Amino acid sequence: MSVVDVIGLLATAAYVTLASAYKVVQFINVSSVTDVAGLESDALPLTPRVDVIVPTFNENSSTLLECVASICAQDYRGPITIVVVDDGSTNKTSFHAVCDKYASDERFIFVELDQNKGKRAAQMEAIRRTDGDLILNVDSDTVIDKDVVTKLASSMRAPNVGGVMGQLVAKNRERSWLTRLIDMEYWLACNEERIAQSRFGSVMCCCGPCAMYRRSAITPLLAEYEHQTFLGRPSNFGEDRHLTILMLKAGFRTGYVPGAVARTLVPDGLAPYLRQQLRWARSTYRDTALALRIKKNLSKYITFEICAQNLGTALLLVMTMISLSLTTSGSQTPVIILGVVVGMSIIRCCSVALIAKDFRFLYFIVHSALNVLILTPLKLYALLTIRDSRWLSRESS
């Protein structure tokens, strides 16, 4: 047995041990969750003022109109202001359609930026023009259930809760094999990862399609948020993760509200999906460094999770590279590694299907192949090109 074989088998053993420990600890924390945001208090009025921000850039008209209509249909009893910000679109048809339809609605503020400055700049412009107690960001390709504002606002009554997010669902789930996988990705990210993090008041990313923030918490952070840099360069993506980390750094809690459902359009082709994943991976690496610097504000579980996720990716990459290098050598190591990965994937898919009581998760085994062959190498590329701040999906639209 060669040195490469030994390294491959050791990496595999370490991966199995780490992944198993992580999932067991995560399951224990998910099962222990009783309050996903914070303790009830009278810090906010029963119906605080809510400002809903909808940044839009070259959005499809029907998609944007559907998004705005879902906000107008909220059952929330308090005052709502809706700010639609056109981020310098080259095609303003959808923005003008919304302006025309809601021109006489006093709840609306319409903002038109003279050039494309990015989602963060659009958010900042809306924040400066409003003064509500709570700020809800809704992506322009997202539709929210009618009780989302009510449920998110209710979860933020404790003064130490700075931000919360709702449950994300792929609106176009039935479009393709990929959208079905992404919908399952979202379910797992929300109902395993986020809900376990929420037990400790430390959801690490209040996802952009549907995230609510407390204005009094966010205001002192806006300068740092707006002018984020990484290695001396402006950082113009991953705004949701960065703002969440800044909230945690300032000592606020962040939470996940599974009953507040937001249905968002997801990539239905592999190329746009991979561009999105590349952007997200770079953002995650950038803010992981910041998160580890504020570990004193985080629970031991959150620190363990951050380390386990990154180390797990590294081990899986080593396993993949060694398997490929030994493919033609006659070694049994690639077979062992493949067997372990397939076996763990089957166990995971079956357990999730049983827990969720939804047997479509058996199909998620396809994602394991996608993860090993494409997403894990993509994460390595993201790390090697971490200084690249291009949005990618906009440039390709």
UniProtKB/Swiss-Prot annotation:
Enzyme class: transferase
InterPro entries cross-referenced by the UniProt entry: Chitooligosach_Synthase_NodC (IPR026463), Glyco_trans_2-like (IPR001173), Nucleotide-diphossugar_trans (IPR029044)
Enzyme Commission number(s) from the entry: 2.4.1.-
Gene Ontology CC entries for this record: plasma membrane
Localisation: Cell membrane
Main location: membrane
Bilayer topology annotation: Peripheral membrane protein
Domain of life: Bacteria
A Gene Ontology BP annotation from the UniProt entry: hyaluronan biosynthetic process
A GO molecular-function descriptor: hyaluronan synthase activity
SUPFAM superfamilies on file: Nucleotide-diphospho-sugar transferases
Keywords associated with the record: Cell membrane, Glycosyltransferase, Membrane, Nodulation, Transferase
Role of this protein: Involved in the synthesis of Nod factor, a sulfated N-acyl-beta-1,4-tetrasaccharide of N-acetylglucosamine which initiates a series of events in the host plant species leading eventually to nodulation.
NCBIfam families: nodulat_NodC
Family listed: Belongs to the NodC/HAS family.
Protein name: N-acetylglucosaminyltransferase
Organism whose genome encodes this protein: Azorhizobium caulinodans (strain ATCC 43989 / DSM 5975 / JCM 20966 / LMG 6465 / NBRC 14845 / NCIMB 13405 / ORS 571)
